[in-house]
Amino acid sequence: MLKTRVIPCLDVKDGRVVKGVQFLDLRDAGDPVEAAKAYDRAGADELCFLDITASHEARGILLDVVQRTAEACFMPLTVGGGVRTVEDIRALLLAGADKVSINTAAVNNPDFVAEAAEKFGAQCIVVAIDAKRVSGPGEPPRWEIFTHGGRRATGIDAVAFARTVTARGAGELLVTSMDRDGMRSGYDLGLTRAIADAVSVPVIASGGVGGLDDLVAGVAEGHASAVLAASIFHFGEATVAQAKAHMAAAGLAMRLDP
């Protein structure tokens, strides 16, 4: 049985770690390489860097952070934010990223996913799906893809899009509820489950963790293969080891460090 992965996520802006509530209101929580080393020591299964500057000028800063992290850490590293071209992906992989997450570029052109998967292999292509619930009370649940940090509606159904990009070669999906992100009220389990049940690739639940029970629910009820969290780890409310022990106690298969 595949073990459930626990993945801390570091939002990086101008080479520094920040954690915003719903992508705004940024708090400086330190140096990304130091934070990554701490998570590596703490037994994180993977680490995710999300570059929220993603401007072209800041690209070199991000590549430097990725390179220094890859040199210092053994856990797999996924990097996303501002990935628009095959060259962007190549540069991140050469800098030491294990996987690259594509967001808006995949929404604008799902064939980009196929091109990337063909060149680099599906195993290192993650598609990030940022979605909001758009169904009204009493209607069957429906979620729509939003871009630009949740500000721009696309009209694209999130579950249909998940099927599309998986068919194009995405090896993994990072599913974030924009309604829940930063709200600490738990994952949108309906969204996570709807996508996980619709595709054959691993789904990472993201957006809204307020406590360790939320991580359990992401897997047990959301059918996710991995759980991503930021605030509860960054600000010391729980350790990765505590998260894994809590999940294992709930009956989930975890990689527990000796």
Swiss-Prot record:
SUPFAM superfamilies in the record: Ribulose-phoshate binding barrel
- Name the PANTHER family on file: IMIDAZOLE GLYCEROL PHOSPHATE SYNTHASE HISHF, IMIDAZOLE GLYCEROL PHOSPHATE SYNTHASE SUBUNIT HISF/H IGP SYNTHASE SUBUNIT HISF/H
Role played: IGPS catalyzes the conversion of PRFAR and glutamine to IGP, AICAR and glutamate. The HisF subunit catalyzes the cyclization activity that produces IGP and AICAR from PRFAR using the ammonia provided by the HisH subunit.
| Subcellular location(s) of the protein | Cytoplasm
Family, per the entry? Answer: Belongs to the HisA/HisF family.
Which species is listed as the source? Methylobacterium nodulans (strain LMG 21967 / CNCM I-2342 / ORS 2060)
This chain belongs to the protein called Imidazole glycerol phosphate synthase subunit HisF
The record's listing under HAMAP family reads: HisF
Recorded hits in InterPro entries, A to Z, give:
Aldolase_TIM, His_biosynth, HisF, IGPS_HisA/HisF, RibuloseP-bd_barrel
Molecular functions per Gene Ontology: imidazoleglycerol-phosphate synthase activity; lyase activity
Answer yes or no on keyword Coiled coil.
no
Pfam families (UniProt xref): His_biosynth
The active-site annotation reads: 11, 130
Query: What's an example GO BP annotation here?
Result: L-histidine biosynthetic process
